[in-house]
Amino acid sequence: MPEFSAPKGVPDYVPPDSAQFVAVRSGLLDAARRAGYGDIELPIFEDTALFARGVGESTDVVSKEMYTFADRGDRSVTLRPEGTAGVVRAVIEHGLDRGTLPVKLCYAGPFFRYERPQAGRYRQLQQVGVEAIGVDDPALDAEVIAVADAGFRSLGLDGFRLEITSLGDDSCRPQYRELLQDFLFGLDLDEETRRRARLNPLRVLDDKRPEVRAMTADAPVLLDHLSDAAKQHFDTVLAHLDALGVPYVINPRMVRGLDYYTKTTFEFVHDGLGAQSGIGGGGRYDGLMRQLGGQDLSGIGFGLGVDRTLLALRAEGKSVGSAARCDVFGVPLSDQAKLRLAVLAAGLRAAGVRVDMAYGARGLKGAMRAADRSGARIALVLGDRDIDAGTVGVKDLQTGSQVSVELDSVVAEVLSQLGR
């Protein structure tokens, strides 16, 4: 047994699995960048009050799942449990909302929630997110959703579905809240659930306990009580999704786990993951900017789970990314050859080729085994006789064929064989 291991619920990604992880993260990010979303890098931890106010004190995230601690200055800070609140804080702090709108940003990285670890549910989770802030336009809602859909499909994932609903606006939510509370207070709920019903009754509909879900099965749904404006907004979003060819299922009982969502709300679900079927989701948050001290601007965004997307691909028997660490592997047969190959490797790397080489006293057989394990397409075999002749052996590791190439022509030959 090793002396140290990763903390419970915190996964390591090591080769070759790490190549698939990186490919998933890159594929999801690239879909956002192609739609004009610029990269933003955020702190891993923030002032605890940012999440308490932004995410909602009645949510499980804030009340049960945050990693919160006092720093050496006795300030309460929290490892970020989600990305939107931090992005909104940065937009306000740096005045991005004073420029061209919408502000369109994308990001990726680790987020932290103290949950019971299981497949697809980690205490350190990896996400890709986008936020579009400053324009209340249903066409923008549809674009954000389409970006997520395109990201999943770019990876070859196809066994997922988009579930969507509307959580209404300020003109219809108060009346619905009263209606829902009247229904909930007529049930035989435990005291903690009744407390949540008083603070935010939608949270009760998000309860995962079977007995609570059974009791709330006939609860009124917000989709049946939308204002005219909220209904028109939702209908327009659906019309845009239809035009974009993005399939969806309307789920009137959907409740997201964060309090800031309004109007359009959505989730991507993959049934191959069992109980933890959500692979991403998001929605509109029209009051969050004002709530965090900024202008009264609307916003919409999503968070996609990199870990869960990788699990979903595996459930479909698919993989992405290459396990190969390099394109070319150097096999030196002497110390002098090692020096010359190091120079060749530098030239190839400058040309954009991934190059590794054998180190230590491996001998030819050991070095060639290392070349095979590396996943390289080409091996460069160099000995003292080759140096005297001014050549190097260029071996195709897929076919086994080998040719001698002049040292000055190696870069061009390798690029040609790699099809570049």
From Swiss-Prot:
- From what organism does this protein derive? Mycolicibacterium paratuberculosis (strain ATCC BAA-968 / K-10) (Mycobacterium paratuberculosis)
Q: Which CDD domains match?
A: HisRS-like_core, HisRS_anticodon
The record's section on HAMAP family has: His_tRNA_synth
- What GO annotations for molecular function exist for this entry? ATP binding; histidine-tRNA ligase activity
| Entries under InterPro entries matching the protein | aa-tRNA-synth_II, aa-tRNA-synth_II/BPL/LPL, Anticodon-bd, Anticodon-bd_dom_sf, His-tRNA-ligase, HisRS-like_core, HisRS/HisZ, HisRS_anticodon
PROSITE patterns documented for this protein: AA_TRNA_LIGASE_II (PS50862)
Pfam families per UniProt: HGTP_anticodon, tRNA-synt_His
The protein depicted here goes by the name: Histidine--tRNA ligase
Protein origin, superkingdom: Bacteria
